């Protein structure tokens, strides 16, 4: 009944940086060629949403519909779309996979660039938006915009998942869990018996711990200044817990002493450039590798002494856990359904969509791991 028509629905609109989201009735236009319109069933709230809303994101455009960790059901498809049909269970992807660009053809990366330029400007690949509110155009966000009852995404930015997958759980595989899990398995390539340090114990850090454990790490040191995070870190597989506030010396020194010279792998899951440096310098001379996952504010730069790298440490970064998205997310959903990957344990709060502000408050206060909003 809605096919080919504009849908009026609720969305949480970010009118401007630094202002709270506002629940509005918006119009969502039908999908154009190569696009898919989705009814969102559930979405997680990620620090990246708050980061963009705060105005720290150099690519943040307003007014916009934020949200990038969702799952839903295909409502209709645009011209030429063959891989999806109405009723399919799907997860929108902020890292697409066109399969044709030089990035997609290179096994070393997952960073498809096919629609990068328009996505960064908050537009669909043809340079226009599908959202409006009272006649005003709203921008898209990260190619996903899940804080709306309906959204439109490019067909290359969508993964079809198992029809029986609980969408209010697997939505988290659209960002946090895949990113952290893959950082350990794909980017760092953690080996059995290794020692790992994870800085920051939000959803991302916990997913890294899960990845390190899956890889057979013998020691996983979890680091956070909020001791409330330690219990769940232990449940996820952390073997040691370190609160930098409990020590007079720098945390990297504490770790080097604890581990007879440093860790094999470290992961920065905060987005703080001082922590990024500490994570690198906690690595073992000769072979230690540090992976940056956290997103720092616009214009910030990382630093260390070149000698740290000259003496055999490696500094890397990762996006979406190195997973080529369209092919990997359905497999991760299957792994979850086969009890190989934890998802439920990340969900500490569930709220109805209209209580989105409460979800942001819980995250800001460090009281939640993930809040899932149900529509």
Curated annotation (Swiss-Prot):
Keywords: Acetylation, Cytoplasm, Metal-binding, NAD, Oxidoreductase, Zinc. It catalyses: a primary alcohol + NAD(+) = an aldehyde + NADH + H(+); a secondary alcohol + NAD(+) = a ketone + NADH + H(+); S-(hydroxymethyl)glutathione + NADP(+) = S-formylglutathione + NADPH + H(+); S-(hydroxymethyl)glutathione + NAD(+) = S-formylglutathione + NADH + H(+). Its EC number is 1.1.1.1, 1.1.1.-, 1.1.1.284. Zn(2+) 2 binds at residues 98, 101, 104, 112. GO terms for biological process: formaldehyde catabolic process. The keyword NAD applies. It is found in: Cytoplasm. Binds 2 Zn(2+) ions per subunit. The modification N-acetylalanine is found at residue 1. Its cofactor is Zn(2+). GO terms for cellular component: cytosol. One of its GO terms (molecular function) is alcohol dehydrogenase (NAD+) activity. The record marks 116 as: Important for FDH activity and activation by fatty acids. PANTHER family: ALCOHOL DEHYDROGENASE, S-(HYDROXYMETHYL)GLUTATHIONE DEHYDROGENASE. Class-III ADH is remarkably ineffective in oxidizing ethanol, but it readily catalyzes the oxidation of long-chain primary alcohols and the oxidation of S-(hydroxymethyl) glutathione. Homodimer or heterodimer with H chain. This is Alcohol dehydrogenase class-3 chain L. It comes from Gadus morhua.
């Amino acid at each position: 009944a809605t096919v080919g028509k504009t849908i009026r629905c609720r969305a949480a609109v970010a009118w401007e940086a630094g202002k709270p989201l506002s629940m509005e009735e918006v119009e969502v236009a039908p999908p154009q060629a190569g696009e898919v319109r989705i009814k969102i069933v559930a979405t997680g709230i990620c620090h990246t949403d708050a980061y963009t809303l705060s105005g720290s994101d150099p690519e943040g455009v307003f007014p916009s519909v934020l949200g990038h960790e969702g799952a839903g059901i295909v409502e209709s498809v645009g011209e030429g779309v063959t891989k999806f049909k109405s009723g399919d269970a799907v997860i929108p992807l902020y890292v697409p996979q066109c399969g044709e660009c030089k990035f997609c053809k290179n096994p070393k990366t997952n960073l498809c660039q096919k629609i990068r330029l328009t996505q960064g400007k908050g537009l669909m690949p043809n340079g226009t938006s599908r959202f409006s509110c009272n006649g005003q155009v709203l921008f898209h966000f990260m190619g996903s915009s899940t804080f709306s009852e309906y959204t439109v995404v490019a067909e290359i930015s969508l993964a079809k998942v198992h029809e029986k997958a609980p969408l209010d759980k697997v939505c988290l595989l659209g960002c946090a869990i895949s990113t952290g899990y893959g950082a350990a398995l794909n980017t760092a390539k953690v080996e059995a018996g290794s020692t790992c340090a994870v800085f920051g114990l939000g959803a991302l850090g916990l997913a890294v711990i899960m990845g390190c454990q899956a890889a057979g790490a013998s020691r996983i040191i979890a680091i956070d200044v909020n001791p409330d995070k330690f219990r769940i870190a232990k449940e996820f597989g952390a073997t040691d817990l370190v609160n930098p506030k409990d020590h007079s010396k720098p945390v990297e020194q504490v770790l080097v002493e604890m581990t007879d010279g440093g860790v094999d792998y470290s992961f920065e899951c905060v987005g703080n450039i001082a922590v990024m440096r500490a994570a690198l310098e906690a690595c073992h001379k000769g072979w230690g590798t540090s992976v940056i996952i956290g997103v720092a504010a616009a214009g910030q730069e990382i630093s260390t002494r070149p000698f740290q790298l000259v003496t055999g440490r490696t500094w890397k970064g990762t996006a979406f856990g190195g997973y080529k998205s369209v092919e990997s997310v359905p497999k991760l959903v299957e792994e979850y359904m086969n009890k190989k990957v934890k998802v439920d344990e990340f969900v500490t709060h569930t709220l109805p969509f209209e209580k989105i502000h409460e979800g942001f408050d819980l995250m800001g206060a460090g009281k939640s791991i993930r809040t899932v909003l149900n529509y």
